């Protein structure tokens, strides 16, 4: 056996210079070598690349009335004051603040209740200082659209490693949701540049497809799609979790192979 030869690493953008401006606990010498050999880059999310992905931050947030979903749709439709001129995170949060003022004309124009906007804003503000949400990277080679870059120049036997280990659990889910959506979309509409098969390795699948995950979760929806149509699409999901019983029944029911053991 020998190491894979065609491996490319994606490290989450960070502010720590001693860690190559990443949020990673990978070996520093390994990272240095990978960057020098151009086998690695940092990834980040500017607002423009993130507008249609915010739903993944709310994947585990119960939304029985669909209010959060309505707000996200409003943002994706460039509703006022989140029009095309809002292109940075600073502009987004400024616009968000304007709709959380009771009685404001901006709020009234959205036709969405103040309480719903406040709930959405409260959750979004937790990520206002997130190092992954920046308008530009540390270097010009940093990637602002991870999911799209994964498919650029993809060749057979490529291995793409996306480091999310040190990220907040919400951010881990966000990145995973972004990637799994792109994989499903690409494999559902194959062209000559699309690989025949893609194998996805993910640890702790129970974070995204457990019996406790809200039914409205977009990540769960993608995973159920993979579990039920993966063979036809050419997507193979390989996952590890501590308790199989905690995994969604439709995921377990479509599992082709299982391995059990103790640690």
Model segments located where?
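P-loop NTPase motor domains
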Residues: 1-225, 232
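Conserved ATP-driven motor cores of ASCE-family P-loop NTPases powering translocation/secretion/packaging/pilus
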Residues: 218-263
């Amino acid at each position: 056996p020998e190491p894979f030869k065609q491996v490319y690493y994606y490290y989450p953008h960070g502010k720590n210079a001693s860690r190559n401006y990443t949020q990673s606990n990978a070996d520093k010498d390994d990272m240095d070598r990978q960057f020098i050999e151009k086998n690695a880059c940092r990834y980040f999310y500017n607002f423009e690349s993130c507008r249609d992905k915010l739903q993944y931050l709310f994947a585990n947030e119960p939304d029985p009335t669909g209010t959060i979903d309505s707000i996200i749709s409003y943002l994706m439709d460039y509703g006022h004051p989140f029009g095309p001129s809002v292109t940075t995170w600073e502009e987004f949060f400024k616009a968000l603040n304007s709709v959380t003022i009771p009685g404001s004309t901006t709020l009234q124009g959205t036709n969405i209740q103040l309480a719903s906007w406040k709930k959405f804003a409260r959750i979004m503000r937790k990520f206002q200082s997130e190092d992954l949400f920046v308008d530009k990277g540390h270097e010009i080679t940093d990637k602002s659209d991870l999911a799209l870059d994964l498919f650029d120049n993809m060749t057979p036997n490529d291995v793409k490693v996306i480091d999310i280990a040190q990220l907040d659990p919400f951010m881990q889910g966000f990145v995973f949701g972004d990637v799994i959506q792109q994989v499903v979309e690409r494999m559902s509409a194959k062209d000559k540049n699309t690989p025949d098969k893609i194998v996805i390795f993910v640890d702790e699948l129970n974070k995204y497809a457990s019996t406790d995950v809200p039914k409205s979760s977009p990540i769960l929806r993608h995973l159920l799609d993979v579990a039920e149509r993966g063979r036809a699409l050419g997507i193979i999901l390989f996952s590890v979790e501590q308790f199989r019983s905690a995994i969604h029944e439709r995921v377990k029911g479509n599992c082709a192979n299982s391995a059990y053991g103790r640690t």
